[in-house]
Amino acid sequence: MSRQRPVIGVFDSGFGGLTVLREIVRLVPNAEYLYFGDTARLPYGTKSADTVARYALGACHFLEGQGAEHLVIACNTATALAMDAIEAKANVPAIGVVEPGASAAAAISKTRSVAVIGTEATISSHAYHHALERLGINAYEKATPLLVPLVEEGWTDHPVTKQVAEIYLQDAFVRREQRSDVLVLGCTHYPLIRPLLRKVVPSDVAIVDSAESTAKALAKKLGIAPPSASAAGATQAAGARAQMAPSAPEPKEGTPDFRFFVTDSVQKFRRLGSGFLGHPVDNVEHVDLGG
């Protein structure tokens, strides 16, 4: 691998972290990417904090062994339950998705009140609540677990998904002492239903995508300025071409290079992953990290 380009390891329990990878590639195109999806052991939301931390550390050490120089924990549950352990035991810098999402929401909230949706485990951890509280923001947290299987089913613009979202969010933006004026997407599946959620929440409520916020935070850490709109479009096209020809001997300057690792079905990851990443997913390897 070229030492001229950063090698960035991205970890998630499954597919949702690909939305984070998509945003990172848009801002940091000239890099080599290693993505690890622990698909055999998802969902992490049903596991204990100790188990999640053990799985997450195993994934991080695997990515380090593959040459990762920076780690992105592209999983809200792993960030919420294991970030302290990762920061203490990882051998390279690591960034999670909670702090960037909370910071982005705090920066734009005028009412100083923010709503957060996520999986049961993420919400129960109160990770966003604590992060927002440190920034002087009140948090309204709501677990919305049914949205995850609906996204994986491909029902990103389905009436059933819209109805489920409406039921979950019916109390999120009612008039309280401080009405929430920002909605944080605290699950990496949810960017795929952002247009649908835009129809559900009031028009004056801003939506913050933790994937976008995390990508910006990583780019800032790397000292990389955001590309222009035209450059970003060219990067996405280059990424698609790179996926279609993964065996190219040396990626061109500015072209991302990808390797994907999964602990379960390679075929399923290719099929579902393309929807999350936005272009074909290839160069996928099966790995077994054991218990």
From Swiss-Prot:
Biased composition (Low complexity): 234-247
Source organism, top-level taxon: Bacteria
GO molecular function: glutamate racemase activity
InterPro entries: Asp/Glu/hydantoin_racemase, Asp/Glu_race, Asp/Glu_racemase_AS_1, Asp/Glu_racemase_AS_2, Glu_race
Residues that, per the record, bind substrate: 12-13, 44-45, 76-77, 188-189
Pfam families: Asp_Glu_race (PF01177)
Main function: Provides the (R)-glutamate required for cell wall biosynthesis.
Protein name: Glutamate racemase
Organism for this UniProt entry: Koribacter versatilis (strain Ellin345)
Lineage: Bacteria, Pseudomonadati, Acidobacteriota, Terriglobia, Terriglobales
Gene it is expressed from: murI
